[in-house]
């Protein structure tokens, strides 16, 4: 919400730029209330909101920039996947992701007893505002999963779209684990001090590799900010973000 408000404030009055935002108050996952906000509650809420924009308000999908930060970035990716797989409506024209949480399984960091020492989850554990501790991770993952088994974080692309245990190219046509059929214009903002920085690189690579008969389908853009922690880099890189928005609005 803060990003959208700041973006609109800075773009106010500029010709050809977005002048309004639609913020979705979706159900949040909460400890001890697995019937209320656990997966797929937020995805269903986002889907209904998207249908409202298109079918009630009359917006065209190609004119929509779908944005999300952190877990909201995870939700934005899940919504694009659902729209692609179900074919109810076209995916939005553009996708803007700020420090998206895209590997809930933590497959990049390796098993807890013997983590990968070169993973940003290990290297950036002291530099990020979030922590790699098991307690912190479970405080977010358990409410999200609800009554689903932990294995869902590894094998469900709606939950962990860049899990290293998923085959990124298993099939050309949906449904599959890859990113064919996603928005053609994608911007990913990340910081080199983030725990999840390597996830964002994997996401950018997998999106760029989305192919049909070997032809690249995406013009992805992954934007790094030096020494910035989780969800803190977009203000530094606002001019570049603004430039991307102006090209794809």
Predicted features and spans:
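Short amphipathic alpha-helix adjacent to the substrate-entry channel of hydrolases
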Residues: 2-22
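Short beta-to-alpha linker loops that shape the active-site pocket of alpha/beta-hydrolase fold enzymes
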Residues: 24-29
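Conserved catalytic-core motifs of eukaryotic protein kinase domains, centered on the activation segment
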Residues: 32-35, 108
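Alpha/beta-hydrolase active-site loop
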Residues: 36-57
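Charged catalytic carboxylate motif
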Residues: 45, 74-75, 199
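Alpha/beta hydrolase fold serine-hydrolase catalytic domain that processes acyl esters and thioesters
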Residues: 55-63, 78-249
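Gly/Ala-rich beta-loop-alpha elbow adjacent to hydrolase catalytic centers
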Residues: 68, 72, 76
């Amino acid at each position: 919400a803060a990003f959208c408000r700041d973006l609109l404030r800075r773009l106010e009055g500029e010709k050809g730029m977005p002048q309004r935002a639609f913020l979705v108050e979706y159900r949040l996952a909460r400890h001890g209330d697995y019937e209320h906000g656990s997966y797929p509650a937020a995805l269903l809420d986002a889907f209904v909101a998207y249908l409202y924009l298109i079918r009630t308000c009359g917006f065209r999908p190609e004119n929509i920039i779908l944005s999300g930060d952190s877990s909201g970035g995870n939700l934005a990716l899940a919504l694009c996947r659902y729209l692609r797989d179900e074919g109810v409506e076209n995916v939005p024209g553009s996708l803007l992701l700020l420090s998206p949480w895209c590997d809930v399984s933590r497959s990049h960091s390796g098993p807890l007893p013997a983590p990968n020492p070169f993973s940003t989850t290990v290297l950036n554990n002291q530099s990020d505002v979030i922590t790699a501790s098991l307690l912190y991770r479970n405080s977010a993952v358990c409410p999200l999963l609800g009554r689903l088994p932990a294995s869902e974080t590894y094998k469900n692309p709606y939950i962990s779209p860049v899990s290293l245990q998923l085959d990124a190219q298993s099939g050309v046509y949906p449904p599959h684990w890859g990113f064919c059929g996603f928005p053609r214009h994608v911007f990913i903002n990340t910081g080199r001090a983030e725990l999840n920085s390597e996830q964002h690189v994997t996401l950018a690579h997998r999106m760029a590799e989305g192919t049909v008969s070997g032809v690249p389908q995406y013009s992805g853009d992954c934007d790094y900010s030096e020494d910035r922690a989780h969800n803190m880099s977009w203000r530094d890189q606002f001019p570049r973000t603004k430039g991307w928005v102006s090209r794809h609005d």
